[in-house]
Amino acid sequence: MSKPKHPRTLAETEAQALTRNIRVSPRKLNLVAGLIRNKPASQAVAILTFSKRRIAQDVRKTLESAIANAENNHQLDVDQLVVVRAEVGKSIVMRRFHARGRGRSSRIEKFFSHLKIVVAERAAEAETTEQKAA
């Protein structure tokens, strides 16, 4: 009859997870997201597990959710998953008041972020090396 309201924007071999309103600035979150881009999913989980940054555990939870979505919802092979995209976006800014001297005030801004992780199934590396040799 009509098109679905939200057509699938991902490929058949991709799955995603989205976390909204994380209490960290986008600049800091992007540093951690850069550690896992274009890495195999198992290696990315290991990197985040042993990272010293506070936000790394929230990123790890989102990555594990994307892996679970790939396995359960899209029947993808977990061993072949690669982090294709780790997108960081701005969210709300919470503004606070800070009293200063001589009756003045200043503003404290607390930034929030969105995180979207897309994992995709890649073919085995042995097949790609055979194609290059041919």
UniProtKB/Swiss-Prot annotation:
Q: Which GO terms describe its biological process?
A: translation
Q: Which SUPFAM superfamilies match?
A: Ribosomal protein L22
In the UniProt record, does the keyword Nucleotide-binding occur? no
User: Which keywords describe this protein according to UniProt?
Assistant: Ribonucleoprotein, Ribosomal protein, RNA-binding, rRNA-binding
Q: Which GO terms describe its molecular function?
A: rRNA binding; structural constituent of ribosome
Domain of life assignment: Bacteria
User: Which Pfam families does this chain map to?
Assistant: Ribosomal_L22
Q: Do you know which PANTHER family this protein is assigned to?
A: CHLOROPLAST 50S RIBOSOMAL PROTEIN L22-RELATED, LARGE RIBOSOMAL SUBUNIT PROTEIN UL22M
Function according to Swiss-Prot or TrEMBL: This protein binds specifically to 23S rRNA; its binding is stimulated by other ribosomal proteins, e.g. L4, L17, and L20. It is important during the early stages of 50S assembly. It makes multiple contacts with different domains of the 23S rRNA in the assembled 50S subunit and ribosome. The globular domain of the protein is located near the polypeptide exit tunnel on the outside of the subunit, while an extended beta-hairpin is found that lines the wall of the exit tunnel in the center of the 70S ribosome.
Identify this protein by name. Answer: Large ribosomal subunit protein uL22
Annotated organism of origin: Gluconacetobacter diazotrophicus (strain ATCC 49037 / DSM 5601 / CCUG 37298 / CIP 103539 / LMG 7603 / PAl5)
